[in-house]
């Protein structure tokens, strides 16, 4: 069964159900294969380019990722998302987990998902395609989901331009990568700002990031 069909069989989508698909796959693997696959993730740092890697990442790191996104969102005044349409820009999105968890979080607060445009930035073709599948399962058919197959430094101002009154940006486990030019990134964000902009930065849980 194709992955898209696996998700469709879940009924109403949620992060927990997405992870359940990954869980069922991973526990069916022989331990030796599972360990070799885990080593290929390099603690979640390597680009994901296979269905098996993406499912193991979801199985291994998904719940921790969800907890960090929820914790970050607790600092936001969610009223802004009840009163306005909004855009989402997910930088280095991987499988789109930050956006998925954000949509789930809105649902737990009984807030209608009013996303108009979603921009998924990710250099891995496989992960980006998986992110698009995940995100489209949450939104109405008229919602514009745009994929940008680039590294962060290569993204242009035009590609992240938003015309909605509210835009939320997610940087999840990405800004600690030394190769990213943070000054250049800040300049791009500043040049594209329109309306209210919320920037959610989530990093590894280690003492150096406190």
Name each model feature, range by range:
Residues 1-40:
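N-terminal auxiliary segments of SAM/dcSAM-dependent transferases
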Residues 45-79:
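Class I SAM-dependent methyltransferase Rossmann-like catalytic core
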Residues 95-111:
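Conserved SAM-binding loop of SAM-dependent methyltransferases across substrates and taxa
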Residues 124:
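Conserved SAM/SAH-binding beta-strand->alpha-helix loop
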Residues 129-162:
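S-adenosyl-L-methionine
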Residues 165-181:
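A short SAM/SAH-binding and catalytic strip from SAM-dependent methyltransferases
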Residues 183-195:
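A short glycine-rich, Lys/Arg-flanked "PGG" loop and its adjoining helix->strand segment in the class I
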Residues 195-206:
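Conserved beta-strand signature within the Rossmann-like core of class I S-adenosyl-L-methionine
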């Amino acid at each position: 069964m194709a992955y898209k069909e696996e998700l469709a069989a879940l009924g109403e989508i949620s992060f927990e159900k997405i992870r359940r698909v990954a869980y069922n796959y991973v526990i069916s693997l022989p331990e030796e294969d599972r360990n070799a696959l885990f080593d290929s993730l390099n603690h979640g740092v390597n680009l994901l380019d296979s269905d098996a890697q993406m499912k193991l990442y979801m199985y291994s790191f998904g719940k921790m990722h969800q907890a960090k996104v929820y914790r970050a969102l607790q600092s936001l005044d969610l009223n802004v998302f009840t009163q306005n349409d909004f855009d989402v820009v997910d930088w280095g999105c991987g499988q789109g987990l930050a956006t998925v968890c954000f949509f789930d979080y809105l649902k737990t607060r009984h807030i209608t998902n009013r996303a108009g445009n979603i921009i998924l930035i990710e250099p891995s073709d496989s992960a980006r395609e998986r992110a698009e599948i995940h995100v489209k399962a949450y939104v109405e058919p008229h919602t514009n989901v745009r994929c940008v197959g680039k590294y962060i430094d290569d993204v242009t101002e035009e590609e992240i331009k938003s015309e909605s009154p509210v835009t939320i940006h997610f940087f999840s486990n990405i800004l600690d990568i030394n190769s990213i030019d943070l000054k250049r990134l800040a300049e791009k964000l500043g040049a594209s700002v329109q309306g209210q902009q919320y920037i959610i930065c989530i990093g590894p849980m280690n003492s150096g990031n406190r």
